[in-house]
Curated annotation (Swiss-Prot):
Keyword field contains Nucleotide-binding: yes
Upper classification of the organism: Bacteria, Bacillati, Bacillota, Clostridia, Eubacteriales
Keywords (A to Z) from UniProt: ATP-binding, Chaperone, Nucleotide-binding, Phosphoprotein, Stress response
Positions carrying Phosphothreonine: T175
Gene encoding the protein: dnaK
Cysteines paired by S-S bonds: none
Species, as recorded: Clostridium botulinum (strain Eklund 17B / Type B)
Protein name per Swiss-Prot or TrEMBL: Chaperone protein DnaK
Single Gene Ontology MF annotation: ATP binding
InterPro entries, A to Z: ATPase_NBD, Chaperone_DnaK, Heat_shock_70_CS, HSP70_C_sf, HSP70_peptide-bd_sf, Hsp_70_fam
Biological function: Acts as a chaperone.
Domain of life, per lineage: Bacteria
Region Disordered, residue ranges: 579-616
Length: 616
């Protein structure tokens, strides 16, 4: 069985880990970093960038750079790039493809299976969309687990002999979750979960952006938010200021030539204090308090019973957030986990549980939202209450609302509101063939089945006729099987293009390196090389130079090999008499051409890894 990777597919950054020797290890990406920006950028020539290289050029290419796509998972949102629409699943799959490739490079083997985390408060549509993204990227998603639960796994793996209750406060780039868990004897039981899928670090950035923009507008009469390039510079500066204010009491925001008018160029030079930052973002911090209260209430425990507070997500580095949690709980948060990496580490632990590498661990998670159906009068009738341990299955008997009714439409809803229309409709299906009878007589058994991923299946059975209908919830906002298959094929095609482009870059790197080494060595050896031998080497050298910028990679490889062999033969003659090492001829190393492949930070090699020409 191959390795199963654990992926934290984040709003702002993503992280991947794997179990090695019984311990979870965070995998560094091709740029040498432990996290990868969840950013995708499309270039004018159709090429595609993912990760840090995409983020670096977002200011100059704001229209075709996609950030925070996770906030649109499970919705009908589309990204229009040059007339082609991309779903959130497809954009997320591009990020997952890079993560998958980085993991394969690290492990030295193909990776086809993964455990992916989602915010605990993600609904069914959002979970299904995440699973679809994995499939498009070429990954079989064995398990979807909640981020706070994953963090608890990372925290509690070495503390399984003790019994205690913990509160996980997870404030990421785009979502907020809070979960109450009980740990003991290898069992990680989620008692309750709550959250806000529209609260995260992006919102803190937006507050700072608005503050800068309003200050500038008051002074200059220009709204920078109407200029896409200026807006992107504002976003980058706001994020940088937020990060700096986590460790400093004041930061300077300096953006020269941000715009211009008839009077000339305009600049931003603004000092932002931590006190001011806390003031403009206080409402966001306070929004996280109510979900904590609800989670404690649902778990039926008091704050005094919580023994440990775990902070997860990069946004928990904001001092005001830490202070708010401390004030609410009366406890100092634990420093035992890395907020950026612990979710991926926990996902890797869960992967280890699935493979049997991690033993004596049982994870009991819950469904975050109430599930039910719409009944007479538009009422949402619950079947499975929120915070029910999953997997679970529950049935309930319903009947017809009219005389001689031969079919019923069942509207599956998810949410906490009393009326069905106020909740999220996950899907509809029809049970036909009901025997005509007075209303209230037919017995229709509706069954909800939630698997360990939190994904829902619903069935309806007419107990009188035996007629049955069922639905695996795939809301209209998700991709159907044909769309997923099409996206998978496109992703495979792009992966093949990536492979070819990388091979081309490496072949050209090898040729360039060899040409440089040969010319350098010939100059340094001078008269030690006979005219006849020099002519032979020069002939092969010129032959390689003539074709190295062409498209025939096999010819370039052949010419590279021929030049290598020819020069090695010549240098052997020169050094044989002196008893030297021919590989040291003028610093020449016949294998040095391959050295270009060993430089992971070479821009050409790295960028080629994840550029795709959509027109091919």
């Amino acid at each position: 069985m191959g390795k199963i990777i654990g992926i934290d597919l984040g709003t702002t950054n993503s992280c991947v880990a794997v179990m090695e020797g019984g311990e979870p290890v965070v995998i560094t990406n091709s740029e040498g970093a432990r996290t990868t920006p969840s950013v995708v950028s499309f270039q004018a020539d159709g090429e595609r960038l993912v990760g840090q290289v995409a983020k670096r050029q977002s200011i100059t290419n704001p229209d075709k750079t996609i950030i925070s796509i996770k906030r649109h998972m499970g919705t009908s949102y589309k990204v229009d790039i040059d007339g082609k629409n991309y779903s959130p699943q497809e954009i997320s799959a591009m990020v997952l493809q890079k993560i998958k490739a980085d993991a394969e490079s690290y492990l030295g083997e193909s990776v086809t299976q993964a455990v992916i985390t989602v915010p605990a408060y993600f609904n069914d549509s959002e979970r299904q969309a995440t699973k679809d993204a994995g499939k498009i990227a070429g990954l079989e998603v064995l398990r979807i687990i909640n981020e706070p639960t994953a963090a608890a796994l990372a925290y509690g793996l070495d503390k399984m002999d003790s019994n205690h209750k913990i509160l996980v406060y997870d404030l990421g780039g785009g979502t907020f979750d809070v979960s109450i868990l009980e740990l003991g004897d290898g069992v990680f039981e989620v008692l309750s979960t709550n959250g806000d899928t529209k609260l995260g670090g992006d919102d803190f950035d937006q507050k700072v952006m608005d503050y800068i923009a309003e200050t500038f507008k008051a002074e200059n009469g220009i709204d920078l938010r109407q200029d896409k390039m200026a807006l992107q510079r504002l976003k980058e500066a706001a994020e940088k200021a937020k990060i700096e204010l986590s460790s400093s009491m004041q930061t300077n925001i300096n953006l020269p030539f941000i715009t211009a008018d008839a009077t000339g160029p305009k600049h931003i030079d603004l000092n932002l204090t931590r006190a001011k930052f806390n003031e403009i973002t206080n409402d966001l911090v306070q929004r996280s308090i109510e979900p904590m209260k609800k989670a404690l209430s649902d778990a039926a425990i008091s704050i005094d019973e919580i023994e440990k507070i775990i902070l997860v997500g990069g946004s928990t580095r904001i001092p005001a957030v830490v202070e708010a949690v401390k004030n609410f709980t009366g406890k100092d948060p634990s420093k035992g986990v890395n907020p950026d990496e612990c979710v991926a580490v926990g996902a890797a632990v869960q992967a280890g549980v699935l493979t049997g590498e991690v033993k004596d661990v049982l994870l009991l998670d819950v469904t975050p939202l109430t599930l039910g159906i719409e009944t007479a009068g538009g009422i949402a009738t619950p079947l499975i209450e929120r915070n029910t341990t999953i997997p679970t299955k529950k049935s309930q008997i319903f009947s017809t609302a009219a005389d001689s009714q031969t079919s019923v439409e069942i509207n599956v809803v998810q949410g906490e509101r009393q009326m069905a229309m106020d909740n999220k409709s996950l899907g509809r299906f029809t049970l036909s063939g009901i025997a005509p009878a007075p209303r209230g007589i037919p017995q229709i058994e509706v069954t909800f089945d939630i698997d360990a991923n939190g994904i829902v299946k619903v069935s309806a059975l007419d107990k009188g006729t035996g007629k049955e209908a069922n639905i695996t919830i795939t809301a209209s906002t998700n991709l159907n099987d044909d769309e997923i298959d099409k996206a998978v094929k496109e992703a495979e095609k792009f992966a093949e293009e990536d492979k070819k482009r990388k091979e081309k870059v490496e072949t050209l790197n090898n040729a360039d390196q060899l040409i440089y080494q040969t010319e350098k060595a010939l100059t340094e050896l001078g008269d030690k090389v006979s005219a006849e031998d020099k002519a032979k080497v020069t002939e092969k050298l010129e032959a390689l130079k003539a074709i190295k910028d062409g498209e025939d990679l096999e010819a370039i490889k052949k010419a590279t090999e021929e030049l290598t062999q020819e020069f090695y033969a010549v240098s052997s003659k020169v050094y044989a008499a002196a008893g030297g090492d021919p590989s040291q001829a003028g610093g020449f190393d016949p294998n040095a051409a391959g050295g270009a492949q060993q430089e992971p930070h070479d821009d050409n090699v790295v960028d080629a890894d994840f550029k795709v020409d959509d027109d091919k």
